[in-house]
Amino acid sequence: MSDIFSHTALSNLAEFSVSELSGSIKRTVETAFEQVRVRGEISGYRGPHSSGHAYFSLKDDRARIDAVIWKGTFSRLKFRPEEGMEVIATGKITTFPGSSKYQIVIESLEPAGAGALMALLEDRRRRLAAEGLFDSARKRPLPFMPRVIGVVTSPTGAVIRDILHRISDRFPVHVVVWPVKVQGEGSGEEVANAIRGFNALKPGGDIARPDVLIVARGGGSLEDLWSFNDEIVVRAAAESEIPLISAVGHETDTTLIDYAADVRAPTPTGAAEMAVPVRAELEAQLSGLAARLSGSVSRQMDNRRQGVRALVRALPSLDQLLALPRRRFDEAASGLGRGLELTTLNKRRAFERSASGLRPETLLNGLKHHRQRITERMHRAETLVERRLLQGKGRVDSFDSALRSLPARLLGQLERQKERVVTAARRADTAVLHRMAQNRSGLAAHDRILQSLSYKNVLNRGYAVIRDEENRPLTRAAAIASGAAVSMEFADGRVSAITTGEGTPAPETAAAPKKKPAKPASSDPGNQGNLF
């Protein structure tokens, strides 16, 4: 009897086809789990598919569930999913009746607390540091006075305006901006491509190669700044041949690009201050150096002049040099005559004493003989005296000539020394004037470049700038109301006008190109270059 009742109960159950049962299960599951919140670790993530969707799994230590993020949702995520990251996913459960599978369609994704992101960030930092990407030996010094500065940042917002304004105030130079996204999906790839793109520019090409790069972004949360922790961005910064300044977030924010950059700036404005010096300070230093150099040259010239005057005063006069030799010559000449007379007198007296006792013949013969000897001696004495006088006179003349030529040689040496001093002073003056002329020429060239990039050159070709009553430029017809007071600026002046009708936008066609985001107004648009 029990078997009969059991068979009857089973035969009363509703019968389903496989499709009907799968559809019923699908409706039950999707109704019961229409909105769920799941915590798990990302597994099998390989980035978005070519279709733009992202497929991966969420797992814990006991189970795994497939997950998908559709393309539209993926582009709105605040941070990029990564393999091994612990997240909290919010979405709905869907099933596939044809294969008896289910998955979660994620509508929002967030890290499982800041601790999970910080742990992932620290692990990545240690791994890249072990490769040597953060070594201080890789870092390069910034150029003292760059000619071109490359900026990688968003083309809109306050960051680029602050950088351009600060550079213009300190030392106006040419700035090239590479516009990128600084948040969201794909922003990391754009920043890395911009850094590599600047490094790929050739010197002397159509686009000036920067001398220094600034990678900048405003402040934000850890998720907002996560793109600058991407490994691709860090490697691009470390491989950059151009010195790079990191200016991401506020002073308290730290990203991995800060470790790979050559210099970290606390803010984007601080990066602009690091990139260029203050022009007024350079001019003051140059003026001070020129004044010091001029004063040093003047002091050297004065010292040399005083030395020459001291040497001239120390030289004796010609009369003083010849006084002693002349006195000695006069004494020698006067003593020679007196000695000769004394010798002759003594000989004569001796002769007279000897002749008193001789016979006349002997006396005559002896006298004749002595006279002859005396005559010969007198002749030799006269000859000797004349020779000695001539020798003495020759020596005196030679000494006199030497004494006369001595002041001339000293004066010649002094003149040559004076010429050397004057030549050195002229060379120093010429070098100083040449250097100052070069500096003035460089400053004039920069001024001409600034003038050539002024928007007023565009007005000279027939264009005009229309401004409202608050002097703001009007760039859209739809922004002008009927009866509004406007001013039109031409190359030669301004004209006031009143509009007679409301502005209407130009009709768009299907083939119209995509509009570019309007750039913010700048006080001096000529300072900013652009690649696009």
UniProtKB/Swiss-Prot annotation:
The keyword RNA-binding does not apply. Residues 499-512 have a biased composition (Low complexity). This is Exodeoxyribonuclease 7 large subunit. It comes from Agrobacterium fabrum (strain C58 / ATCC 33970) (Agrobacterium tumefaciens (strain C58)). Its main location: cytoplasm. It is found in: Cytoplasm. One of its GO terms (biological process) is DNA catabolic process. InterPro entries: Exonuc_VII_L, Exonuc_VII_lsu_C, OB-fold_nuc-bd_dom. NCBIfam families: xseA (TIGR00237). It catalyses: Exonucleolytic cleavage in either 5'- to 3'- or 3'- to 5'-direction to yield nucleoside 5'-phosphates. Keywords: Cytoplasm, Exonuclease, Hydrolase, Nuclease. The gene is xseA.
